[in-house]
Every structure is written in C-alpha cells, then in structure tokens.
Amino acid sequence: MDPRQSRITELAIAIKKQTETLQSLLDSLKVATPSFSVNANQELPRNAAVQLAQSSILDSCTELQDLVEGPLAHVGRIMSPRVHISSALQAIVHFNIAEKIAKHETISFGEIAKRCKMDVDDVKRIMRLAISYRIFKESHIGFVNHTASSFLIAENLLVRQWISLCCDEFIPAGSFLVPAMKKWPSSEEPNETAFALLHKGDSLWEVLKKQPEKAQRFAHGMEYMRTLPPFDINHLFTSLNWEIDCEMVLVDVGGSQGSIAEALLRRHPRLRCYVQDLPETLSKAVVPKDLKGRLEFVSHSMFKEQPIKADVYLLRSILHDWLDGYALQIIRNLIPALEVGSKVIINEICLPEPNAISAYEAQLIRGYDLSMKQQFNSKERDVHEWETLFRLADRRFKLNRIVNPPGSFLAVLEFEWQPTTP
C-alpha cells in the first residue's frame, strides 16, 4: 500500500478488489449477485474461495464503518440502535408478523395491526426499525413488503425459534452478568450465573427440564446454529476424513434429536449410531424410516457412567457448556466403556490466539465465549486448555490430531485411549 494513503482509503481500495473477486467467483458459479429481493438466495455458495472473499469483505467493511463513525459514535451505536433491534425482532416473532404477510403482498400498517391484533402505532414503530435493517421494506408510505430477510423469518421455523430463544432468554440474562460475577466470583456452578439470576436460581438445564416447550425451542435454536456456514456438518466430514464405507459404532453424547447422527449415517452406510441425551430432550425424537436399525435414541445423563461400548464417542458443542470440574466428570465417565484405540472426538470451538483471525470473526467467537459465561458459567477453550483438560481427566488419553477447517468455527480434536501409555 502507498504509505501516503490513509487507512480508510486503503480499505476502500481493498473492498473494491475483494468485491470484484467475489463477483467473479459468483459469475463462474452462475450464482446471482446478493440482493435484498424476496427471491434472493438465502446465503452465498458454501465454497471455500467464496467464503474467503466474503469474510475479507465483511472484515474490511466493518473496520471502515468503525473508523468513519469515530469512537464517540462507534461506542454509542453499539448500544443503540443495535440493542433495540432485538426488541423489534422479538415482537415480529411473538406476533407472527412476518408469517401474516404473503410473499409478494403489499400491506398497510393498519392491516398488519388487524391481522396480528396489535396497536397500529406499535406496528409502525417496530416495523420501521426493522426496515432500517432491511428486514421488510416500505415500498411507499405506510405500505410494506417482504425482503429476503423478513421472508426467511416467515418461512423458517428454526430462525424464529432462535430469535425467540435469544430475545426471551439469552439477551435478558446479559443484564445480570455483572451482578452474578459480583455475587459468585470464580464460581463454576451452572446455577450461579446471570441466567440463574434471571430465573430465580434455576440453571438453564433446570429450566429446560421443567418446561418441555422451552426444551424444544432450545433444541430448535441449536439446530438453527448448525445450519450456519461456520457450523456446517460438512466441515466435520472433512475433518474426520473417514472412508465412506467405514464400519464403526458411534455414540453421539448429548446429541439432542439426532441431526448430526443422521447426517453421518447417510454419508457412511455401514456406520451405526446411538444418540444419547436427557429424556425431555429426546421426548419428540424420531428415527427416520431409512435409518431404522442403524440409529437408536438412548436416554442417558453424561454425568453417569457410559453404558455403551463403541469405537467413537462424539461430543459436539458439549464440553463448552461446562467448566473444568464438570467437564472432567463427563470425560471420566467415558473411561469404563473405552477399549484400546477407542476415539473421543471433540467438535468444538478452539479459541485462536489474539489477532489470529479477523475482527469480524473474533466478535462472533468471543461473543459465544461470553455467552457461555452468562448462561452456564462455562467457556470456550483454546488448544492448551483442551490438552490440559484431557491430561487432567486421565493421562492415558493421547491427542492424535487437531483440525481447523477453513471457514469453520468448530475444530476437531481427536483423542485416543491408550491404556498402556505410561
């Protein structure tokens, strides 16, 4: 870069080049340019080159916006209006606003209020904030249409459940983080959290056990997260690098309603899977017809001794819910079932070193880490913390490999049980 150029000029030039690269890739793949149209694609192709270009653009644009705003406006804008859009989205989902509008319909605020049984002024204020985020559009004064984002909310149950989970539970819990840290400094207990203060002492797990409808919503929310590109199941396939016809028995520990196991089974026709979770989580789990005889749901607490002998034990986004004392219990409960060469595969965020990834990605990953603190008193771990955790659990665990697939937030850490290890 020319040393005489300002940083904002450098970023503008970089964004132009990055955008041209992305457009060229989309043209070569015969994919339409991104747009806000209701008919637009919901995401860019899950192609490594496309995702790299996309990530570069987003990081450059974020930095440029932050610089141009200046620190006074930047800090202010983080708090408002970004905080308030969550309230608008909560109302949009609660009152089924997006679902009440047909895909190509133009509708007045008054008609929306009538269909959703709302005050018309409330509708107008909520909708116009959402519109500023390009969720709906006001085609002419007082009349709105769907955009790509609003129609996604209308047609995708998992998106609505994720919004509801965040707005009803996670975001309100955030306001109790400081009181929880002051009341229970250094606590590892799941009922001494910001979430527990919000829920009169109940941990998130206790709330889910008492309220099946919330357990179902939580399961849907986690399923939505798995649909996002950084959590794509194909990253797991790439990292495992198993032969298609591999013949193994796998236990998916805390596998919820089986979406990961189903994907693995359909990719590997000789694989057999047991999905373990609590009874309330499995209450609505169903084995698909094409997987009968190969997939089984088993009620089991990971805090009890593992009853199933298998070749592989998969823990995907499980241990980050627990600080070390509890995580060690979970790992040690696997040991009675392990045989020489048994694998324990951890599919979790492996926190990068500072400045190793873009600020745009770091905001997401560090946000997940703080969310773990708020909800569970737990955390995301870096590679040294993962190695230390398994060494403390039992020195007979050997770390075979760590894979960080490009474009994925989840690493694969493969530990092998070697009881002869000194």
UniProtKB/Swiss-Prot annotation:
GO molecular function: O-methyltransferase activity; protein dimerization activity
Disruption phenotype: Prevents the conversion of free tyrosine to O-methyltyrosine and, consequently, the synthesis of KK-1. Does not affect the incorporation pattern of unmethylated normal tyrosine by the A domain of the 10th module of kk1B.
InterPro entries found in the cross-reference section: COMT-like, O_MeTrfase_dom, Plant_O-MeTrfase_dimerisation, SAM-dependent_MTases_sf, WH-like_DNA-bd_sf, WH_DNA-bd_sf
Active-site residue list: H320 (proton acceptor)
EC class name: transferase
Signal peptide: none
Keyword S-adenosyl-L-methionine recorded: yes
Enzyme Commission code(s) on record: 2.1.1.-
One GO BP annotation of this record: secondary metabolite biosynthetic process
Pathway(s) annotated for this protein in UniProt: Secondary metabolite biosynthesis
Binding site for S-adenosyl-L-methionine: D277
Keyword annotations from UniProtKB, A to Z: Methyltransferase, S-adenosyl-L-methionine, Transferase
UniProt function note: O-methyltransferase; part of the gene cluster that mediates the biosynthesis of KK-1, a novel cyclic depsipeptide with 10 residues which is a promising active compound with high activity against many plant pathogens, especially Botrytis cinerea. Within the pathway, kk1A is responsible for the O-methylation of tyrosine as a free amino acid before its activation as an aminoacyl-AMP by the corresponding A domain of kk1B.
Family named by the database record: Belongs to the class I-like SAM-binding methyltransferase superfamily. Cation-independent O-methyltransferase family.
Protein name: O-methyltransferase kk1A
